[in-house]
From Swiss-Prot:
Entry keyword annotation includes Lyase: no
Catalytic activity from the UniProt record: 4-CDP-2-C-methyl-D-erythritol + ATP = 4-CDP-2-C-methyl-D-erythritol 2-phosphate + ADP + H(+)
The name this protein goes by in its record: 4-diphosphocytidyl-2-C-methyl-D-erythritol kinase
Binding site for ATP: P95, M96, G97, G98, G99, V100, G101, G102, G103, S104, S105
HAMAP family: IspE (MF_00061)
GO biological process: isopentenyl diphosphate biosynthetic process, methylerythritol 4-phosphate pathway; terpenoid biosynthetic process
Role, per record: Catalyzes the phosphorylation of the position 2 hydroxy group of 4-diphosphocytidyl-2C-methyl-D-erythritol.
UniProt-listed InterPro entries: GHMP_kinase_C_dom, GHMP_kinase_C_sf, GHMP_kinase_N_dom, IspE, Ribosomal_Su5_D2-typ_SF, Ribsml_uS5_D2-typ_fold_subgr
Family statement drawn from the similarity comment of this UniProt entry: Belongs to the GHMP kinase family. IspE subfamily.
Matching SUPFAM superfamilies: GHMP Kinase, C-terminal domain (SSF55060), Ribosomal protein S5 domain 2-like (SSF54211)
UniProt keyword annotations, A-Z: ATP-binding, Isoprene biosynthesis, Kinase, Nucleotide-binding, Transferase
Biochemical pathway: Isoprenoid biosynthesis; isopentenyl diphosphate biosynthesis via DXP pathway; isopentenyl diphosphate from 1-deoxy-D-xylulose 5-phosphate: step 3/6
């Protein structure tokens, strides 16, 4: 096989707590990831005549060398001394700066997809370790299962959750993750708790207060939607989400959203759509 089209799914942080900051600047956290059945789509073709990595469609304002897709392909190439190349096209549906994992998911899909097409033979654990150098969220997308993440995001405990319906909305702003994690008001001392204790609690996000203080668009949207459901932040935003018992209930609130606001209704997935697709070929 020399070509494959793979999903690059969105994720939600169902909760996110910051437990501390290491000497190297990375934050220690506890978060619960679940995948969604919506996302981007990545078309990967391999070339055997040369080792060039070609991106068919660049992201406006992002240099090729800084693009996580390109960096993921080059990283795998270097790690495995692979002499083959690739041509990669992305159909983008997820927003940048949304907190639903678009860039990290793209990087993971490329790592997993090229490992399959190039037959480089790395395990998922090896790919996840490789992906961590690209971003703290990349390993969860590589692993492909709903998981409780600790450390800086690299310590993963798979778990099963109800696959609920979610409404995800994004105000017309993008939020740089680094700006939130650098904010002096960000809580960094939330006590670590066991997964069983966290699953028994109401869930929250330590980044939400800071985001709502700095971005009135997020604050105003959450307040406006309180009449329908309690929305909360995913990641560092700007997307917010709420859970619903049915697709119909989620779509009803979606139809009441502010005019032309970006959003989607999606179902939680305990197994990543990426891995479901790859399993069809194995």
């Amino acid at each position: 096989m020399n070509r494959i089209i793979l999903p690059s799914p969105a994720k939600l942080n169902l909760f996110l707590y910051i437990n501390g900051r290491r000497a190297d600047g990375y934050h220690q956290l506890q978060t619960l990831f679940q995948f969604l059945d919506v996302g981007d789509e990545i078309d990967i073709s391999i070339t055997t005549s040369n080792s060039t990595i070609e991106l068919v469609n660049d992201i406006a304002g992002v240099a090729t060398e800084d693009n996580l897709i390109y960096r993921a392909a080059k990283l795998l190439q270097k790690k495995t001394a692979c002499q083959q190349g690739a041509k990669i096209a992305v159909a983008k549906h997820l927003p940048m700066g949304g907190g639903v994992g678009g860039g990290s998911s793209n990087a993971a899909t490329v790592l997993v997809g090229l490992n399959y097409l190039w037959q480089t033979g790395l395990s998922l654990a090896q790919l996840a370790e490789l992906g961590l150098s690209l971003g703290a969220d990349v390993p969860i997308f590589v692993a492909g299962k709903t998981a409780f993440a600790e450390g800086i995001g690299e310590i993963l405990t798979p778990c099963e959750l109800p696959e609920k319906w979610y409404l995800v909305l994004k105000p017309n702003i993008s939020i740089e993750t680094s700006s939130i994690f650098k904010d002096p008001k960000l809580p960094r001392n939330t006590p670590e708790r066991s997964l069983s204790a966290l699953l028994a609690e109401d869930w929250g996000n330590d980044c939400e207060k800071v985001v709502r203080e700095h971005y009135s668009e997020v604050e105003d949207l959450i307040q406006e939607l309180l009449q329908y459901a309690p929305f909360r932040l995913t990641g560092t935003g700007a997307c917010i989400f709420a859970e619903f018992a049915s697709k119909a209930e989620a779509e009803k609130v979606f139809n009441c959203r502010p005019h032309n606001m970006y959003g989607f209704v999606a179902k939680g997935q305990n197994i990543s759509p990426l891995h479901k697709k790859l399993n069809l070929f194995s």
